[in-house]
Amino acid sequence: MGLRGLLCVCLVSLLALQAVAAQGSPTRNPKGGKKRMAVDAAVDGVVIRSLKVNCKVTSRFAHYIITSQVVNSADTAKEVSFNVEIPKTAFISDFAITADENAFTGDIKDKVTAWKQYRKAAISGENAGLVRASGRTMEQFSIHIIVGPRSKATFRLTYEEVLRRKLMQYDIVIKVKPQQLVQHFEIDVDIFEPQGIRKLDVEASFLPKELAAQLIKKSFSGKKGHVLFRPTVSQQQTCPTCSTTLLNGDFKVTYDVNRDDACDLLVANNYFAHFFAPQNLKKLNKNVVFVIDISSSMEGQKLKQTKEALHKILGDMRPGDYFDLVLFGSAVQSWKGSLVQASPANLEAARNFVQQFSLAGATNLNGGLLRGIEILNKAQQSLPELSNHASILIMLTDGEPTEGVMDRTQILKNVRDGIKGRFPLYNLGFGHDVDLNFLEVMSLENNGRVQRIYEDHDATQQLQGFYEQVANPLLRDVELLYPREAVSDLTQHRHKQYYEGSEIMVAGRIADHKLSSFKADVRAHGEGQEFMTTCLVDKEEMKKLLRERGHMLENHVERLWAYLTIQELLAKRMKLEGQEKANVSAKALQMSLAYQFVTPLTSMTVRGMTDQDGLEPIIDKPLDDYLPLEMVGPRKTFMLQASQPAPTHSSLDIKKLPDQVTGVDTDPHFLIHVPQKEDTLCFNINEEPGVVLSLVQDPDTGFSVNGQLIGNEAGSPGKHEGTYFGRLGIANPATDFQLEVTPQNITLNPGSGGPVFSWRDQAFLRQNEVLVTINRKRNLVVSVEDGGTFEVVLHRVWRGSAVRQDFLGFYVLDSHRMSARTHGLLGQFFHPFDYKVSNLHPGSDPTKTDATMVVKNRRLTVTRGLQKDYRKDPRHGAEVTCWFIHNNGDGLIDGIHTDYIVPDIF
């Protein structure tokens, strides 16, 4: 029987390594007795015959292969799934399925090519993708297939990563969750480290320590280490007669290497890797400023956990450290306004300050950061004894700038100009409301990094854990130097600081192939002295050393270099725009394809494996800022994929919006761009809250957009202070598509219990010919194949706003494919019409110009005025000059405005 891929929308973040039957549930088989007895490991006739994880680590480069064989012993075809969790830092490099003696292999191509193929077929509403959802540190890979009766299928997934040293160790984390007993289960880890292995430990969160010691074999000697976990079926059982499994959790291998020398050089096949982690250095004293968001959104558990973490961090300060605290809400306040020594008295006073501070309004992020920068800069300038300390700026926020300077480009410039490369900035984004991309760019531009703090019971530990990584700087201004003519394509080799327990890693090409030896010089500033060392490696000795690897990965140095280079290029492109960004992206894409890595710029399709509509599955790399979302409803009807970019024509690039605008926003002000006149008309509609107005109605297709008005303030009947759109209904009956949009939620097909999304979600939905992109906390774009493209803008209440409840704006991005019979308050203007303006003269308001307009055979008095386009800036908007038609658009719109009142949004 042939193999066909089924639709898979698996968007919940499960920490799992699975190969399970998609149908049925484990059947208990109690038979009594004290001894473990043979139980039926099949689930609905499907059994996992084997599940093996093989990991080979060579000089920090980890190569994983997960292989699973599933057997369908039933007389009918069964749907089975293969689900695994892999580290976010990893790149998938291969995937294959073997079934009925047929092999289906992965093919990596650039994302644009894959997406064109994918989108063309996906218009039907079906999903050919292998959707992966992000957890904290892992990503989920999932595929569903049909296995024929009395048949078997074998899955093989390969992925690679570079292990980073944190807190004195390297971590290999394998998620284990088979959900049923496995006949042959195995985790096999081989480690080869030329420096020699100093320690090797294993933890299995799902096993008691005593049992783990019995079942897990570990050994290390010299350069090699080995871990083997191979439980029998009876050892997997939760009880002697149970058919349920113990295997559910993390399998974690940790190790470290010897540090006899300050650095270690590795050369192979004209590539080199340099690992620098000197030991026994005196700790540098540090100057640290904590910049803390105390806006109202930090209320509750987040504030409590932040205070708890600060208390513990203050307790870890050393006497030679200097510090200060800056708080920002609507205003900015600092504890001392200058650095003070971490004396017992000052630390106690700081703890009291932390205990007592409270929330304060909006989010003046720019002001808080600049105050922190100012404190560090002044200390270095006015106190010479502090200039040799390691300065660090740490900022914690849970939201976006809503007070003071809010333009992100300006904030980035202000921070760059303030820091000027003197010290690193570490940004901590608390929860999923933060703009993590913005914070990451800011950190990257200032020699730091970003980390998300998840809203959970352990947020205090997350904050403290981050601080521990930067708490003990050992060197500053570290520079790793190589023979200029002998190397090329170096990865980052200058670092502001080196921290205890970490490691600096550099890789590059060796351009001079005739070198018999290779050296690296390291220069840095240490505690009270300059640090200098030279690392040297003989190529013949290295060849001899590498022969000891045996079966380990042969080209690991080159692939380590490629991995680091691609990661750095992907980070660099975030900071660039225009042609520079395009050039860096092209280089990252070229390397991703050359080394067959699935990165944010590439996709993998599985050749020869299709669903009933001929779609090949697609594997993509999710971005961290995209949230894992749960799909509710029939998966054949639509597909939601949080990791895919939107198609070109419906992707909303805020910076590239056209100047012309047609839409309706605020109280409600209608704007009609007339391209043939290169001008804009505008009018208001004055109606009561609760009234529903027809905005777009295409009788040829049935497509419609209706909007319901709300008052300025909730709960104030009879008090008319303006009306705004608080509910929109977008419908396309030909494809049974309905979308209800409010300032709180977006609901797909509300009449049939479809999924509900919040404005905190980043998502991409497809249903037949309609595509919807939700851009988190900003807008959503609806695009209809052979129809129009529309945008809904979210307006949030902000401090100082005259509007006291959230509302929506609606804009037309493209309407040229709508039928000539399209109508509605906006729809009637989708096709050309003419008017003439004459007799310009001062109006009743001497600051404005009145004129006579002839339109639709009617003569009107119109006024030159200003309205606003809120697509780029939902808070302040951009001014648009227009001719204002009075009296609810009378004379411009067909009929009168009450003709456009409809019973409901659908």
From Swiss-Prot:
GO CC terms: extracellular region
Keywords, in A-Z order: Glycoprotein, Phosphoprotein, Protease inhibitor, Proteoglycan, Secreted, Serine protease inhibitor, Signal
PTM section of the record: Heavy chains are linked to bikunin via chondroitin 4-sulfate esterified to the alpha-carboxyl of the C-terminal aspartate after propeptide cleavage.
Domain of life: Eukaryota
Primary location class: secreted
Pfam families according to UniProt: ITI_HC_C, VIT, VWA
Compartments, record wording: Secreted
Propeptide residue range(s): 23-29, 668-906
Modified residues (Phosphoserine): S124
GO biological process: hyaluronan metabolic process
SUPFAM superfamilies: vWA-like (SSF53300)
Residues carrying sugar: C55, N583, S643, T648, N745
Signal peptide: 1-22
Domain VWFA: 287-470
Record InterPro entries: ITI_HC_C, ITIH, VIT, VWF_A, vWFA_dom_sf
Protein role: May act as a carrier of hyaluronan in serum or as a binding protein between hyaluronan and other matrix protein, including those on cell surfaces in tissues to regulate the localization, synthesis and degradation of hyaluronan which are essential to cells undergoing biological processes.
Subunit structure of this chain's protein: I-alpha-I plasma protease inhibitors are assembled from one or two heavy chains (HC) and one light chain, bikunin. Inter-alpha-inhibitor (I-alpha-I) is composed of ITIH1/HC1, ITIH2/HC2 and bikunin. Interacts with TNFAIP6 (via Link and CUB domains).
Name this polypeptide is given: Inter-alpha-trypsin inhibitor heavy chain H1
